[in-house]
Amino acid sequence: MTGVQTCALPILALSPMMTHYLETKKQYPDCILFYRLGDFYEMFFEDAQTVSKELELTLTGKDCGLEERAPMCGVPYHAVEGYLSRLVQKGYKVAIAEQMEDPKQAKGLVKREVIRVVTPGTLTNSQVLEESKNNYLMGIVYIDGVFGVSTVDVSTGDYLVTEVRNERSLLDEIYKFSPSELICNEAFYMSGIDLEDLKVRLNAVISALENRFFSDDSCRRILREHFHVEHLEALGLADYETGAIAAGAVLQYLYETQKNTLEHLTRLTVYTTGQFMMLDTSTRRNLELTETLREKQKRGTLLWVLDKTKTAMGARMLRTLVEQPLISREEILRRQNAIEELNMNYISREELCEYLNPIYDLERLIGRISYRTANPRDLIAFGNSLAMLPYIKQILKEFSGELLKNLEAALDPLADLKELIDKAIVEEPPITVREGGIIKEGYHEEADRLRHAKTEGKDWLAQLEQSEREKTGIKNLKVKFNKVFGYYFEVTNSFKDLVPDYFIRKQTLTNAERYTTDRLKELEDIILGAEDKLVSLEYDLFCQVRDQIASEVNRIQSTARAIAMTDVLASLSVVATRYNYVKPHINEKGIIRIKNGRHPVVERMMGGEMFVANDTYLDNGKNRISIITGPNMAGKSTYMRQTALITLMAQIGSFVPADEADIGLCDRIFTRVGASDDLASGQSTFMVEMTEVANILRNATKNSLLILDEIGRGTSTFDGLSIAWAVVEYISNTKILGAKTLFATHYHELTELEGTLSGVNNYCIAVKEQGDDIVFLRKIVKGGADKSYGIQVAKLAGVPAPVIDRAKELVEELSDADITARAKEIAENGPGTQTRKKVAKPDEVDLQQMSIFDTVNEDDIIKEIMELEVNRMSPLDALNTLDKLQAKLKNRWMHQ
């Protein structure tokens, strides 16, 4: 079957139904159109070809008034959600055209309208959405250098807005929320941000909308109307002009695609990025907070360790808390105290977890109820969840801490809604809403009467069957039913001669005949009339119950949030007691003191093996920077990540893996750990490293924690050492930065900075030598390492013996003693005393003009070459000198 393009079809030649299909399709050109025909949603032309391929459906054809049949495929209406979700997850948008009237009662063409457009960011089907993760739609507006960012999860009702003023902060927000769909104005689309890269990294659909979505007046109006306020100041948007446009554009997009009142979007949360600890994309990735670097999975992350939640709502809230650590000491202490109180009341906590466990996803249930897509089983799940609330509320009353008391007060048992569901809905209803069997007996008088007529009708049929058997002598006479012929008598051919004259033939089969009578017709009208009326009435009654629940959306969402936070606190309490965590003291003096700290994830992954704990001490004075040396594989990276994770956990409000901990509030954590080429962006390992270092040096503050691992290793030894050295000098200077820093390096020459730069201290990983072999003790000790043990590590890794032996020979010849001696000289003389052109001390430099490297004059290099005593230089000296001169020239050319 050849592909027929809808744009090229002669409309006048088409059938009326197909003409309407194409008119509807024209209104939604970027969507696949699901067009309801009876019990199926059908697709035609190129949509059919696309869907049949994507969903592996049979492609057929339909007469459409043209010589060539229209390509067609379809899916059953009762199973549409699964097919919809599969298409949307592949990045398609789907418009659903529903029958708006009963085809039996329609005069002419059945009326059909698009009732909803389903997109990746507007999915509400809980069977498809990941329970523990939000499904976000994000709107971005770029106006006059300001990015307005609004994020919404229509499945839960979460709705947020903020503003950022640079591209890096914007990308951090995007990756933090990881939306499945992103809509934007044309200015953002053309701003130079690599949208193709964003699509790939997020696996998201990105669309630039028409300008009408971003009209200042219309965005403000739609927000005022939705939230029933006269001024946007009431929403906290007084100082968020661009943010308001983003929030309004998102709302208008939802109105147009969902064709729904969106009554479950009850509040707009306005936030600033400064309300929480800043974690850039690199830090989130390197610390593996919610997803591992390689496998992209939850197992092996901090979230995996902390997540002992019992509800989907709690799991999502915990993820949010991990990604947004607090910087408010008061709020941290409230969480800590709640966890401590739960720890001290073990039995009550276990009871709490027991009652939390059966609770369904209230946030997404009320979302579907508000959307009017919830089915009878959703209401039963909702009612069963409400049954747990009084018990949870009673347990929370036992606690005296501020946060737990607030949660108890916010938890509404919703007894009236529980009673409504118990009275109205049968305990095991069908999943569909239009086939009856939903409403309980005794709930509605007319429904009971129709149900009784339906039940009695079956008795009447049985009596009629028996009566006609006796009257006719047809022993196997039976009353049967099907949807085409209704009720009928079936008589086999062997008794055909006994059929009386008042039997009216309806159908002839191979082995039997089917008949009706006036009395059977009369009973059929009564019974089927009662059934049809009952099914219709039950649907109306179900909708009334659903509407009544939807009208209480504010109460339900408030309770859902209270349940989610209760679940999170219980989870953190379980983790604290199970893994022997301690309550950290939170200080505002900038001190980080950890006694016997442990890496929360590595400790759990090790199973029965003992984790070697380590101490950490950093402050804003004499202990700002720890230079950490030692061989690869010894545990430097684990130790540094451990310190960052303990700090982050403390600011979540969690207990931490240590014997003692005193954590100074950090405004940001930056990490530069590991190296990987960013091939998608065409950036090398070293370029990625330098970009991240530049970001850290430009955006860190004295209250930040920096985790820097092997800075400078992606280039030549001399360049790398120079960069690492300059970075330490820059960070150590309190007039410039003065941030608390863990700096791991294989450049032992950097240990010379201790005693010459304020706040720098040397630490190393203890190693025990046994002949040519080494044992990693995993212990951080004071002082610098005197060897890198690279050959021993290579031996442990299984490098062939001849290579190891040759390496031992070469290491004696290629000793870096000259480099070390020169480094010591530079350190003793201080920054800027080198024999080449003087480099100013960091505090003498205009920060706006400062660069890591200074440039050299070509005449200086020529003079240096002329003064060389070549005849007295060893081959190694000559090579070292040539390398230095080459590096200087490269640096000069880079700055031309």
Segments (PLM) and residue ranges:
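Active-site phosphate-binding and catalytic loops of NTP-dependent enzymes
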Residues: 97, 120-129, 261, 397-403, ...
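Charged, surface-exposed helical/loop "interaction arms" that form contiguous linear patches used
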Residues: 371, 375, 385-388, 402, ...
